[in-house]
Amino acid sequence: MNLITIISNQEYFTGKVSACYLIRMAYEKAGKEREKLRNLYYKLCDDETPLIKRTAAKEFGPLCLIMEKEIVNPEMINYFKKFMSDSDSVKVIALSSLIQLVKLFQNTDNQRLNVQVVVAASEDKSWRVRHELARIFPQLIDGFGNQINELVPTLGNLIKDSEMEVRNVALEGLAQIIRFFNTEKVSICIIPAILSVANDSTPHVKASIGECLGPIARSVGYSTFNTKMCTLFDSLMKDENAEVRLGYV
């Protein structure tokens, strides 16, 4: 405890960065010293040095998993909100903590906050934040449970994103998780999103669409699939790019 206190108050960033890691490692066995550790962590979260704040954000999710739930909400959640209104680099790192938070708040009213965070991140001005959300989206399924259907429109927006990297990552994850979605949501939100990027200029995006078609057909039924997506399937099978055609063989 004394070591963590000393290095967390050092002038140089190296000690403070190390303290972020050590607080998590020491917390479970800290007993009555836990409150002191939390206060040291909160101070690091408020540090003006970007590297220290990013390190604190990185430790946020794992630390929440070992903290008492009555501490996580509201104390830790307040800092999560601060992270998500900080610089792009901090938001990207903090966003990965959603993986832990949705599991922690599973089947509780607090899950509503996480839904709001996902929606806000999907509308963030920074494409890096939207890309990170698309990347972790498949890992949020278990924690959200049935509430994930509320976020199908959000995933549809990520598929239609203005940045190719975001579109591609969103499509890559879709094939893994579409079976968890309500069929009606897939028809209303996912299929139109895919059709809107069918003529994408990037071969990677078109190839990723190919990986989704089978799962989509199984989700909505082959009759609906043939009605809505048969033309798309045929056009991609004849695409001039060999990489795209290969994905449909």
Task: Write out the residue ranges for each language-model feature.
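HEAT/HEAT-like alpha-solenoid repeats
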Residues: 1-7, 32-45, 70-84, 108-122, ...
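Short, intrinsically disordered, charge-balanced linker/junction segments flanking boundaries
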Residues: 5, 26-28, 84, 236-241, ...
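Alpha-solenoid helical-repeat scaffolds
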Residues: 6-8, 12, 18-26, 43-45, ...
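Short inter-helical turns and helix N-cap capping residues of alpha-solenoid HEAT/ARM repeat scaffolds
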Residues: 11-12, 48-49, 86-88, 125-126, ...
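Residue-level signature of alpha-solenoid helical repeat scaffolds
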Residues: 17-25, 58-62, 78, 96-100, ...
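Residue-level signature of the C-terminal ends
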Residues: 25-30, 63-70, 101-108, 139-144, ...
